Amino acid sequence: MATRHQVRQSVISLLYAFELNSQNNVFVDEILDEKKIRNEQKNFTLNLYHGILDNLNNIDETLNSFLNDNQITALGHVERAILRLGAYELLFTNTPSAIVINEAIELAKELANDNSPKFMNGVLDALIKAKK
């Protein structure tokens, strides 16, 4: 059974693939099969993925307010996907903020450049503080 961390890795893969080819969602089942995401974890993955897409404009507007000199679209695909996932979980789910930030940092360490973990922490921490 896949862990929640592996589920989040899959969501990042789905968001990345969506950005590269938003006209076609055939990649969804392929990515989930490849990563062995099944049953309850598949439902969790798809809920996160579709929740992000359904709220993408709101998420991006919120994130843009915490990106000093950049827009979310100026970031790399992976960094953008990690921030969108983190923001979605903070804004629309009951996942504890400490877990969201830790997962974003771990995903950034695995998938992004060396400066990304600190950047993810700063942006998502600012979002948490503004939300209170």
UniProtKB/Swiss-Prot annotation:
GO cellular component, one term: cytosol
SUPFAM superfamilies: NusB-like
Keyword Transcription among UniProt keywords: yes
Gene3D superfamilies: NusB-like (1.10.940.10)
Tagged with keyword Transcription: yes
Swiss-Prot/TrEMBL keywords: RNA-binding, Transcription, Transcription antitermination, Transcription regulation
GO biological process: DNA-templated transcription termination; transcription antitermination
Source domain of life: Bacteria
Any Pfam family: NusB
GO molecular function, one term: RNA binding
Similarity annotation: Belongs to the NusB family.
HAMAP family: NusB
Function summary: Involved in transcription antitermination. Required for transcription of ribosomal RNA (rRNA) genes. Binds specifically to the boxA antiterminator sequence of the ribosomal RNA (rrn) operons.
Protein name (record): Transcription antitermination protein NusB
Organism: Campylobacter jejuni subsp. doylei (strain ATCC BAA-1458 / RM4099 / 269.97)
